[in-house]
Swiss-Prot record:
Record function comment: Mediates homophilic cell-cell adhesion. Minor component of the myelin sheath. May be involved in completion and/or maintenance of the myelin sheath and in cell-cell communication.
Protein family membership: Belongs to the immunoglobulin superfamily. BTN/MOG family.
Single Gene Ontology MF annotation: signaling receptor binding
Subcellular compartments: Membrane
Glycosylation sites: 58
Keyword Disulfide bond: yes
Name this protein carries in UniProt: Myelin-oligodendrocyte glycoprotein
């Protein structure tokens, strides 16, 4: 009986030590959680990519960063309580900021300033605590600030107010013409002194031209403006592709 106890006691102690070691290792583990949906931003605006650890814990002493594929380009890196700007990819230098007001709760966010078309795509956020590291994916969608403008919208914007204005002017013109014909017929001799004699006999095609021409002018101008804006944005995008740094 004493022999059994002498054999079982060391094995029990060994099991307890293993359990303690496992509990310590699991106590330092966590998960990294991203926003779960794409973050959208306009060209030239700012974008914030949030990231947190679960369960929440103080991440001040951890290494926190964002990188992009390919080649794991460093977008932003926080280590030893400081931002490591020297390790950033050249295209992100001076454009990123780590928002760490809630880092004591394990919550941070990456702010990207002056967003470019080339910033669109996937990002990886990671937290590293000594030798343990977890990460999560974050996606950024960059949108054209004039994405809602198209020729159909331009036509609608131009036509509706201008058409209402021109219809109103045309109706007033026809009303005055009819009234002058009926009421001032007897005074036509006097009217000839102040009005063109052809004023009371304006052909329909002239009235139509009078109504349509002012509508087409602003519409053409808006379409030209729309094409210019899109060419400018496309040129900016191509320039970023040629000179990413």
């Amino acid at each position: 009986m004493a022999g059994v106890w002498s054999l079982s006691l060391p094995s029990c102690l060994l099991s307890l030590l293993l359990l303690l070691q496992l509990s310590r290792s699991y106590a330092g583990q966590f998960r990294v959680i991203g926003p779960g949906h794409p973050i959208r931003a306009l060209v030239g605006d700012e974008a914030e990519l949030p990231c947190r650890i679960s369960p929440g814990k103080n991440a001040t002493g951890m290494e926190v960063g964002w990188y992009r594929s390919p080649f794991s380009r460093v977008v932003h890196l926080y280590r030893n309580g400081k931002d490591q700007d020297a390790e950033q990819a050249p295209e992100y230098r001076g454009r990123t900021e780590l928002l760490k007001e809630s880092i004591g709760e394990g919550k941070v966010a990456l702010r990207i300033q002056n967003v470019r078309f080339s910033d669109e795509g996937g990002y990886t956020c990671f937290f590293r605590d000594h030798s343990y590291q977890e990460e999560a994916a974050v996606e950024l969608k960059v949108e054209d600030p004039f994405y809602w403008i198209n020729p159909g919208v331009l036509a609608l914007i131009a036509l509706v107010p201008m058409l209402l204005l021109q219809v109103s002017v045309g109706l007033v013109f026809l009303f005055l013409q009819h009234r002058l014909r009926g009421k001032l017929r007897a005074e036509v001799e006097n009217l000839h002194r102040t009005f063109d004699p052809h004023f009371l006999r304006v052909p329909c095609w002239k009235i139509t031209l009078f109504v349509i021409v002012p509508v087409l002018g602003p519409l053409v101008a808006l379409i030209i403006c729309y094409n210019w804006l899109h060419r400018r944005l496309a040129g900016q995008f191509l320039e970023e592709l040629r000179n990413p740094f």
